[in-house]
UniProtKB/Swiss-Prot annotation:
Family according to the record: Belongs to the two pore domain potassium channel (TC 1.A.1.8) family.
Sites where the protein binds K(+) 2: 130-131, 257-258
Keyword terms, alphabetized: Cell membrane, Endoplasmic reticulum, Glycoprotein, Ion channel, Ion transport, Membrane, Metal-binding, Potassium, Potassium channel, Potassium transport, Transmembrane, Transmembrane helix, Transport, Voltage-gated channel
Record GO terms (molecular function): identical protein binding; metal ion binding; outward rectifier potassium channel activity; potassium channel activity; potassium ion leak channel activity; protein heterodimerization activity
Protein name: Potassium channel subfamily K member 12
Length: 430
C-alpha cells in the first residue's frame, strides 16, 4: 500500500477588496459641495454666455458703427468747409450741445421732465429698476434723496413682484387643477360627487397633483407675447415707431433692461393724452410683472439643467472611485447567511464550528449597529411627520421632506423659495 503524500491545502488567494469608504466619501463630498458646484458651474456658463453674446453683437453692430463714424466725420468736415467754421470750434459747440442733451434739452419740443407727471414717470422707472436714463437728478439734494428713495423703493417693488409671482402661480395651479378634474370626470375616472376637501380627495391622485413647470412656462410665454403685441400696436399708432421697434421697446422695458434709446410718453402733447398715459402705465406694470415671473420659471429649467450636469459629473466621479456593479463587495455589518463561509472552510479542511462563534458575534454586532441607525432615522422621520401633521391640522400645511436635496429645489429664498413645492418639478417628492 503506497502512501501518498498529503496534498497541500489550496493556496488562498486574497482578494483585494475595494475601500468601502471611498464612494461614500465621494458622495458625501459631492452632497456637501452641491450648492457650491452649482454656483461655480452657473458662473462658468454665464461667462461663456457673455463671451458668445459679445462675439455675436460685435459681429453685427461693429460694421454699422464704423460706417456711422465715417459718415459723421465727412459731414463735420463738409460743414466746416461750407460755413467757414474751424473744426475745433465746431467740436466745442457740439460738446455744449451734448451737455444740454444730457440735461434734458431737446431740439424738438418735449414735455417738462420735472413736473408731477414727469417726476412720477421717473420714480416709476427707479423703483422698477428700469432706469431709462432720459431723466436724472442734477442737484446734490436730488442725488442724495435718490439713494435713500431707491433703496427702499426697489426692495418693496421686488417684494411686490415676488407676491405677484406667488399669486399667478397659485392661480395657474388652480385653473389647471380644475381642468384636470373636469377631464377626469368626463373620462369616468372621477365620481360626479367629487368635492375638494372630502375624504375621497385625500385618497385620489389629485391630492398631490401639481402643474408642470413646462405648462406654466407655456402659459406665461403666450401671455407675455400677447401683452407685447397689444402694447406694440399702441406704441406704433401713438409714438409713430415701427412695429419691430415697438416690440424691441416692450422687451427692453418689461425686462427692466431700460436702455433709454426709445422712451414712451415723451412728447409735449398726445391725442387722448390721459388715456394713453394710463394705458402706458398699465402695460408697463403688467409687462414687468409677467416677464419677471417668466424669468423665474425659466430659471427653474436652468437649475434643472445644472442639476443634471452635476449628476453626470458626480456619477463619473463615483465610477472612478467605486467598483463596478458586478464586483463583489465586502460589507462589514451586512446581515448575510453563513453557509458560503462554512462551505469555504470545509473545502479548506478547517472546522467550521471553530469559527462560527466569532462570525456569529460579528454578525450580531452588525445587526445591533444597523438596528440602532434604523431606530435613530425612524425617530427623525417620526418627528418630522408629527410636525407636518400638526401644521396641517392648524391650517398651515407645509410640505416636509426628509431628503432635503433630492431635486435641488428644496429651501431657497426669493422667487425660488416662493415656487418651492408649488410646481411638479420643484415638488419635494421628486
Amino acid at each position: 500500500m503506497s502512501s501518498r503524500s498529503p496534498r497541500p491545502p489550496p493556496r488562498r488567494s486574497r482578494r483585494r477588496l475595494p475601500r468601502p469608504s471611498c464612494c461614500c466619501c465621494c458622495c458625501r463630498r459631492s452632497h456637501l459641495n452641491e450648492d457650491t458646484g452649482r454656483f461655480v458651474l452657473l458662473a462658468a456658463l454665464i461667462g461663456l454666455y457673455l463671451v458668445a453674446g459679445a462675439t455675436v453683437f460685435s459681429a453685427l453692430e461693429s460694421p454699422g458703427e464704423a460706417e456711422a463714424r465715417a459718415r459723421w466725420g465727412a459731414t463735420l468736415r463738409n460743414f466746416s468747409a461750407a460755413h467757414g467754421v474751424a473744426e475745433p470750434e465746431l467740436r466745442a459747440f457740439l460738446r455744449h450741445y451734448e451737455a444740454a442733451l444730457a440735461a434734458g434739452v431737446r431740439a424738438d419740443a418735449l414735455r417738462p421732465r420735472w413736473d408731477f407727471p414727469g417726476a412720477f414717470y421717473f420714480v416709476g422707472t427707479v423703483v422698477s429698476t428700469i432706469g431709462f436714463g432720459m431723466t436724472t437728478p442734477a442737484t446734490v439734494g436730488g442725488k442724495a434723496f435718490l439713494i435713500a428713495y431707491g433703496l427702499f423703493g426697489c426692495a418693496g417693488t421686488i417684494l411686490f413682484f415676488n407676491l405677484f409671482l406667488e399669486r399667478i402661480i397659485s392661480l395657474l395651479a388652480f385653473i389647471m387643477r380644475a381642468c384636470r378634474e373636469r377631464q377626469l370626470r368626463r373620462s369616468g375616472l372621477l365620481p360626479a360627487t367629487f368635492r375638494r376637501g372630502s375624504a375621497l380627495s385625500e385618497a385620489d391622485s389629485l391630492a398631490g397633483w401639481k402643474p408642470s413647470v413646462y405648462h406654466v412656462l407655456l402659459i406665461l410665454g403666450l401671455f407675455a407675447v400677447l401683452l407685447s403685441c397689444c402694447a406694440s400696436a399702441m406704441y406704433t399708432s401713438v409714438e409713430g415707431w415701427d412695429y419691430v421697434d415697438s416690440l424691441y421697446f416692450c422687451f427692453v422695458t418689461f425686462s427692466t433692461i431700460g436702455f433709454g434709446d426709445l422712451v414712451s410718453s415723451q412728447h409735449a402733447a398726445y391725442r387722448n393724452q390721459g388715456l394713453y398715459r394710463l394705458g402706458n402705465f398699465l402695460f408697463i406694470l403688467l409687462g414687468v410683472c409677467c416677464i419677471y415671473s417668466l424669468f423665474n420659471v425659466i430659471s427653474i429649467l436652468i437649475k434643472q439643467v445644472l442639476n443634471w450636469m452635476l449628476r453626470k459629473l458626480s456619477c463619473r466621479c463615483c465610477a472612478r472611485c467605486c467598483p463596478a456593479p458586478g464586483a463583489p463587495l465586502a460589507r462589514r455589518n451586512a446581515i448575510t447567511p453563513g453557509s458560503r463561509l462554512r462551505r469555504r472552510l470545509a473545502a479548506l479542511g478547517a472546522d467550521p464550528a471553530a469559527r462560527d462563534s466569532d462570525a456569529e458575534g460579528r454578525r450580531l454586532s452588525g445587526e445591533l449597529i444597523s438596528m440602532r441607525d434604523l431606530t435613530a432615522s425612524n425617530k427623525v422621520s417620526l418627528a418630522l411627520l408629527q410636525k407636518q401633521l400638526s401644521e396641517t391640522a392648524n391650517g398651515y400645511p407645509r410640505s416636509v421632506c426628509v431628503n432635503t436635496r433630492q431635486n435641488g429645489f428644496s429651501g431657497g429664498v426669493g422667487a425660488l423659495g416662493i415656487m418651492n413645492n408649488r410646481l411638479a418639478e420643484t415638488s419635494a417628492s421628486r
